[in-house]
Amino acid sequence: MNKFYKIFNLKPVINVAGTMTSIGASIINKTSLKSVEIIHDKFIYIDQLQKLASQKISKRLKTEAAMVTASSSAALTESIAAIYSKDDLSKIYSLPKMNGKKSVLVQKGHLVNYGGEVEQAIKLSGANIITTGKKISCSEEDIKKSIEKNRNKILCALYVLSHHCDEYNSLDLQIFYKVCSKYKIP
């Protein structure tokens, strides 16, 4: 047994499930660890580092923006808050209080716990939740009906990619994106 486990009286884990917060999330790969070694003993303006990381990540992923966060839950909360507030400081400072469109559309089967509750991460931003479909199924028609019924409330839509979601009868990401784009929902 590894010395680390003995010193701290911890039980070793054999991970056969993938990335899971409850067992330490991810093991840092060697490339990332080398990057940490380069910067760990230096002070740096975090805004500059965040901007640089955003540019590199968004370029690599071919997205309009990207941001490094502490976890998936933090990413959900911060993304929803950013969609709501954009660069309006008064909205940023008022969070989690939101006015106007403040609901997130999400498939009912995507409100899972992956080490943190998706529902809680959404609510921490100040947003409300509008679910669509059933726990084990969601159709294109379900999404369209939910959007048409709640169009004046929806701030954005959320699609959760996780092995905790039941993919059987879940709406495909591309279809979800196509429908939301048609209604101009981020």
Identify the meaning behind each predicted range.
Residues 14-52:
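A glycine-/small-polar-enriched, mobile loop at the entrance of the PLP active site in fold-type I
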